Every structure is written in C-alpha cells, then in structure tokens.
C-alpha cells in the first residue's frame, strides 16, 4: 500500500501495515484477486468522484480553493496531540504526518500546502463541520483493501447441512447418520438406537416381543418353523390332491407300493385356474413373508444389542427372569441417558414418563379399548342357530377382522396413537359411515377367501390335533378358555404373558369345579362302555401274546384286523375313564368357585346364592369350554363371518364411534388412552360425571393424580346393552385390575391412587364417610403399611376384603371366613394369617346371625387384632353399625 496508508494505520492503530498480511487463506483465490482489486478500486473511485463533486458544489467559493490542496503535518510531538500518546515504536520517524489530497499525487508534490503545528489550530478554526466530514470521507479511499474473495452461497462449508424435517419422522440428518451406524461399536450403536427412538410405542412393542419370544435365536427359529409349516401344509394338500391315484389305491388289492399309486408329472396336468393361480398367489405371499422376516431380523439384531449391552440381560436369562425386572432396568436406563442431538423425539416428557404403568399403557393401548368394549358388550356377536339357540361367535378369525376393520381405522399405523378426527363429535356420522364400509368390505373379502381358508384350517387342525388325540385320547375332553372368555377375564393393563400365566394356574381348579357336579346317568353309561371296551381289548391282547404272528394280521371283520380293534377300543376306554369324575371329590361348588375366582378374578353378582346350580355351571362352561368345540367353531365360523361383518356389526358402528370418543383421555407424554386403563377411581362416583384427566406428568411418571385437569366423560351405563350385564364399576373391574397390577409390579411409583382407591371401596358399600376421622385413609392404610414394614411383602388395601363381603345376610363363622378366603382380590394379596385375622374381625363385630352372648369370649382375639390395626377395626365397626341400622 501507499505510504499515506501506512502512516494513517500506524498513527491510529499503532501497527505497520507494510508487515501485515490481510490475505485470508480460507476464502482466497489467487486467480481472482487482481480482478477483485480492480473492481474494488473502480468502485471506490467512482463513489469518491460523485461525493467530491457534491461537496464542491455545496461549499462557498472562498473555501473551495483552500480545500482543493490540503496537507497537514505534525512535527512538534506536542503532548496535547492525541497521536503523541501512542508508543513511539509504532512510528516510522520522530514526526507524524497527515497527508491528504484530492488526487492521486505523490507525497512530495510541491503544490501542497504545509500546515505546521503552530498554525494548525488557527487553520482548523476556519473549518466548519462539513470540512471535517469531508476530510474523514476523503481518507476512506486510503484505507488498505482486504484481499479475499466473497464466497458464493454454495461455497460455504456448511452449505450441505439441511434444516431438520420436523414433519418427517426420519429426518435428513438422522438418515445420513443411520447409513453409517453399522461402523459404530456395538455399545455405541445400542446407545444411538436408544437415544433416537422416535416412536416409543413401537419400540416398547419390540422390546416386549423380544422378551416374550425368549431372545433372538428362539424368535428366528419360530418364524422359520411357522413359515415352513404353512409351506408343508400347502405342499401336502397339493400332493395328495394331484399326485395320488385314489381309485387304484382303494380298489386294487394288488397294490403294495407307493410308486404304484403315484401319478408321474402330476403338476403338469393341472390347469391354470384355479390351482396354478392359487399357487402363484401363495408364492407371492411367501416372498413377502420372507421379506418381512428379513426386516424383523434387522430389528431383532438391534433388540439383541439393547438387551445384552444396555439392560445387561443375555438371551438365556430372558427365559427365566420376570418382566418386572426388565421394566426396572428400562427405568434405570431412562434416568441415566438423554436424547441425542439428532433425535427427532422432541417430546422429552414421553421419555421421562416411563414407569410400569406407562409402559403397559403403551403396549396395550389398543387392547385396553377392546377389553372395555367386550366388558360393556359394545359388539353384538351373538347369532341364533336352530336347535341350539343363541351362540356367541367370537373366533380368532373374527378377531383378525375386527383388528383390521376397527382398530386399524381408529389408530394411526405409524405412531400408534388414536386418530384425532375420530374424537371429534362433529365427525360422528362420517366415522360411523366409514366404519360400516370397512366392516362390509371385510365381510366381502371373507366370502371370497372362505373356501380356500376353510380347507387350510381343516388341514391345519387335523394335523395338529389328530396325533395328540391318538396318543392321548383323554385330550378329546380337555377344555380351554374361549376367545370371548379371554377378553372377559382379562384385566386392564394386563400383559398377555401375565394373563396366560393366571389362566394356566386356574385350569386345574376349573376342571375340579366342573367335574364335581353329579352326573350319575352319564357316569353309569360311561362305566358300562368302559367295561365292555376294556374287556374286549384285554381278550385280544392275551390272544395276540399267545400267537403274535397270526393274530396281528387276523381280520375280525372284512378289512379290519386285530390291531385296528385294539387301537380303537383302547381309545374308547381311555376317553370314558377320563370322563368319569373322581370318587374322592367332595361336592362343594361354592367353595370351589370362590377359590377359582382368585385366579379368574371373575365372580358376577348374579351368581350369588346360586353357586350350586346348573345355571351357574353352564355359564362358566361357556367361558371354559371343550377344545374340540372351539376347533369346530373356528372352522365353521367362515360360514357365519360374512353375516356378522355385513349385517350385525354395522349396526354397532354408531356405538363404537361414541365409545372411542367418550372414553378416551389425553395424558401428557403418553397420548390418548382408554379411560379405564388410567385407574381413575375417584371420579367413579362424581355426580357431575367429570373424569379426572392427567395432563402434567410428574417426576416419577406415575399414575395421574386427583389434581389433574378434568374433561367431560359420559355415564358408562349408556353402553350397557344387556340388562343382565353389570356395569364395569359395580363389577369392580378397574379395582381388581389396579390391585392385580400392583401385585404384579409392586407400587413403588404407583401409590398416588391408593387414597382414591380406598375412598372408592368405601363408596361401593354405600357407607357415607361423614362421621369424622374413623374412616380416613390413614386408618385404612394402617395395617397395610405395617405389613410392608414387617414382612417386606406388599399387602394391598385390606379394606377391600372387608367391604367386598359386607353383605346384609346371616352368615356362619365358616361362611364368613370362606368369603374372605375366596375373595378374588384380598386372597391374592394377603397371606393366610392375615386372612384368618380378617375373617375373625369381620365376624366378631356384631354382624347379623351371631350370638351376642358368644362375643365377649372371643373379644380377646379381636382386641389383639385391633391393637395391630386400629384403623381396620374402626372400619369393621362402622360396617357393623350400618348393618345393625
């Protein structure tokens, strides 16, 4: 740069511009620097010329000549000069100069006027403000120009970055990272997967399926065996239908080898329609299934890393540990990890709200609605059959159709959340119309697929059960719970594996309850048949032992050898023997059914006083029915499914729409869930009909508190379509669900509803808690808290056992104790010692039917128990006073 520029920079900034390189190596381009300097010089020259001409025109004539040639120099080094305050090392010499000219003249131009320091003050006084502005502006051209190229927009290093796509769940940045995720360490990959969960419902479903499938190897083996089972059934059916000459097999007695009845090149003789078309469709479906298995394989690999590395659980441990332990480790992982920067899950509340209750609600979001609909009889699935009467026709096939027609319509397939338009009352007519169309469409599809699928299921069930019935004929009379019973007996937020375990435990008690009913006529007939068949089998076996070679091929009837009759009569003997009840069984159906209710959690009020009748037994047998009957109903259901889907269920479309709209509540961090799954007991008896809705998640992510925001929920009784069907509140469905949920998981984080639960239990006995503090929650919970502290086993509210059996009728001591022991809630959460104390306390507090004279003798036990739990005794006394009144 020019010397003038150097002097200016040195006086103002104390630096030497000759030694400064303002070249920017990041953006510089040597090929364009000269061109850039030329353009910049022309730009500033033009700007200065325009400005200078304007300045000259605006000045007076007297000042134009003075300003035309101006040169100021300071040689004095006066302390008053601000430039003299600078370090002397920054100056080129002992003198400092201010050079200005309005042309590009050199500094030694003799025409410049030199102004000495002593005259500078005088000359400066003659300059007005515009002169100073002109002076400052004229120095602008002397400032050194920075040599760099202005980069274009696409040249920026960060130009490849795209803003995150909020609406797209995948996101551009996340997708680019996901392509490189396989290069990460397994632990880092597992952490990345956990931190970038965008759909928590789907993720928890995958976690639960991995747990119930017992690990990676077991799940993949099951998937391939199921696929090969379908392939084998189709191949076997095709081969037997096309490649065997049945005419020769049945009529030709000279046939002894399979090759004699096998048709060569049998598949080349079949036509395109319908067999080859069916085979091509099956092949396409097989390819799609293989692709789905491949996608599942990728997900299972990630789940394996998640369980093995993050949760510290190997696949072998998954077969023995409880689900509660998995939930606890997920909660620990939740507390120790946060979302990654690239995660699109901005709802941090959903990650914080992840306790056992929230996890169950996410996994069973759809199932909770179905449990409520079946318990409230929203779906009309009954048909009238001649000579049989009304039959409840819910099969596994019908459940698949309901999931497609109803659940897939109300829930979003990607997020798993309920579709918001379905909750708008103004859309009621539209939703009902669309729901009817979907149901009718499913019915039409069933009409088209009925012939093919009926044949498939016949083959499947035949191959599945024939060998079992042949090797163990007693299984032909075995029973299991029907699909309708499984929905009826299932609790809210009860995971499938917990529910199956509960039903499996109840199987033995169910068989004992049914078999103890006297059936003398049938028993006598079965004993006679068993004796005849057993005698013939015994004779044939003895003769066969004497001469095995002759009698094994000896034909008793044309075409029927001894071996055939031994096998057939042996099966008949086994069936009759297992159908005869055990002689040691004691007939006491009431005690048996109450004991059974510990596991089924099902004891309807209309059964009260009729436990010994055939009516109650038949009602229970509709739930726990013959397995052979269920198989036949599953096969024949293809004849009735179109009728149910096209005519019966469309009439329920309005009710289904109203149910989803009026029994859905929104929970922050959780989304819309079924009202009954939130265990809101304190709003069951609200006269205004308001249901408390949890809006703000707490720190523990627990169950909603009573202080949550309220939303209007209608009376649930409007959905009860049968007069004999009790309302869900009277049946204590939610209470039993909540109690069993606490028993399954523990209530470390779910204690907020205990107060509302006890209040609801008091209300259910029609006792008004208005007499002071003797019915407060602390007294009711007194014994429960003491049991937790002493035994370490969590004992849930004992008040439920007291109130549940507090019926106004005469009871003996044995009956009262039986009522307490058989209570479906109390007996599952209380040990036998506490049940015995509870029964005695229940009896010894003035209940009807007791001799008052006998009470003082037993008061010792009562006082001893009262000292242990005064709150419970006060509650018992309160109940007694109500009964006496």
From Swiss-Prot:
GO annotation terms (biological process): autophagy of mitochondrion; lipid transport; piecemeal microautophagy of the nucleus; protein localization to phagophore assembly site; reticulophagy
Catalytic reaction annotation: a 1,2-diacyl-sn-glycero-3-phosphocholine(in) = a 1,2-diacyl-sn-glycero-3-phosphocholine(out); a 1,2-diacyl-sn-glycero-3-phospho-L-serine(in) = a 1,2-diacyl-sn-glycero-3-phospho-L-serine(out); a 1,2-diacyl-sn-glycero-3-phosphoethanolamine(in) = a 1,2-diacyl-sn-glycero-3-phosphoethanolamine(out); a 1,2-diacyl-sn-glycero-3-phospho-(1D-myo-inositol-3-phosphate)(in) = a 1,2-diacyl-sn-glycero-3-phospho-(1D-myo-inositol-3-phosphate)(out)
A GO CC term assigned to this protein in UniProt: endoplasmic reticulum membrane
Biased composition (Basic and acidic residues): 857-866
UniProt feature: intramembrane region: 439-459, 626-646
Chain residue ranges for the region called Disordered: 49-108, 688-726, 847-871
Record-annotated membrane-spanning stretches: 224-244, 280-300, 525-545, 556-576
InterPro entries: Autophagy-rel_prot_9
Key words, A-Z: Autophagy, Cytoplasmic vesicle, Endoplasmic reticulum, Golgi apparatus, Lipid transport, Membrane, Phosphoprotein, Transmembrane, Transmembrane helix, Transport, Vacuole
Membrane topology note: Multi-pass membrane protein
Family statement drawn from the similarity comment of this UniProt entry: Belongs to the ATG9 family.
Physiological role: Phospholipid scramblase involved in autophagy and cytoplasm to vacuole transport (Cvt) vesicle formation. Cycles between the preautophagosomal structure/phagophore assembly site (PAS) and the cytoplasmic vesicle pool and supplies membrane for the growing autophagosome. Lipid scramblase activity plays a key role in preautophagosomal structure/phagophore assembly by distributing the phospholipids that arrive through ATG2 from the cytoplasmic to the luminal leaflet of the bilayer, thereby driving autophagosomal membrane expansion. Required for mitophagy.
Domain notes: Forms a homotrimer with a solvated central pore, which is connected laterally to the cytosol through the cavity within each protomer. Acts as a lipid scramblase that uses its central pore to function: the central pore opens laterally to accommodate lipid headgroups, thereby enabling lipid flipping and redistribution of lipids added to the outer leaflet of ATG9-containing vesicles, thereby enabling growth into autophagosomes.
Name of the featured protein: Autophagy-related protein 9
Source organism (scientific name): Komagataella pastoris
